[in-house]
Design a protein with these regions (language model features):
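N-terminal Rossmann NAD(P)H-binding glycine-rich loop of SDR-like oxidoreductase domains
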Residues: 2-25
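Structured catalytic cores of enzymes that bind and process phosphorylated ligands/cofactors
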Residues: 18, 23, 65, 94-100, ...
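Oxidoreductase cofactor-interface core, primarily capturing Rossmann-like NAD(P)-dependent enzymes
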Residues: 22-27, 42, 118-196
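Conserved Rossmann-fold NAD(P)-dependent oxidoreductase catalytic core, especially the SDR/UDP-sugar
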Residues: 23, 35, 74, 82, ...
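Short, polar loop motifs at secondary-structure junctions
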Residues: 31-38
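NAD(P)H-binding glycine-rich loop region in Rossmannoid oxidoreductase-like domains
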Residues: 3-4, 9, 38, 45-102, ...
Length: 196
């Protein structure tokens, strides 16, 4: 299986990348991002790309893949709806539309979040935007599309959040997260489990 991974330097993406590289059933991983992953592995190829609204310059390198893990994401904290929509909806749909055209047999996996509002009418801005993103992804002509809605994700194996305040929470709550994972598995996952 050949995988494309967006967001390989974020916390969830780091976990997905690690698990993909360890999985004998995965032949290759193409990480598309603004910055390098900092990893070397025979299965790993990287494309550094700045314009997530236009893939025309790299389209030929995005064809021939079986699955995509789309792990790009930002917190909505302190963000207005227009900016959050651009970063969450517009960028995701630009990539997904391109990939669906180039790889019609692709499986697309989108990491979203628990509490996402599929009705697109709720009071929480982030949940509405995520809901619209999910709904429109499901309309694209992929072989299949899956929406992963984790609540809290415990980073393992030295994986860290790029967002300082989020990382501080994970450090402070580390022992509690392990306990929560055992007593409330519906609300807790790990970076291992968020991957294939």
């Amino acid at each position: 299986m050949k995988i494309i991974l967006f967001g390989a330097t974020g916390m969830v993406g780091q976990g997905v990348l690690r698990e993909c590289l360890l999985d004998a059933g995965i032949e290759s991983v193409l990480a598309v991002g603004r910055s390098p992953t900092g990893q070397r592995h025979p299965k790993l190829r990287e494309i550094l790309h700045d314009n997530f609204m236009d893939y025309s310059a790299i389209e030929s390198r995005l064809a021939g893949y079986d699955a995509c893990f789309f792990c790009l994401g930002v917190s909505s904290v302190g963000m207005n709806e227009e900016r959050y929509r651009h970063l969450t909806y517009d960028i995701t749909l630009a990539a997904a539309t391109t990939l669906a055209r180039l790889n019609p047999q692709m499986v697309f996996v989108y990491v979203t979040g628990q509490g996402t509002d599929s009705s697109e009418k709720g009071r929480l801005m982030w949940a509405r935007v995520k809901g619209k993103t999910e709904n429109d992804l499901l309309k694209l002509p992929f072989k299949a599309a899956y929406m992963l809605r984790p609540a809290a994700i415990q980073p393992l194996h030295g994986i860290r959040s790029k967002t300082a305040w989020v990382q501080a929470i994970y450090v402070a709550a580390g022992p509690l997260l392990s306990l929560l994972h055992r007593v409330a598995p519906k609300y807790m996952t790990t970076t291992e489990q968020a991957a294939p």
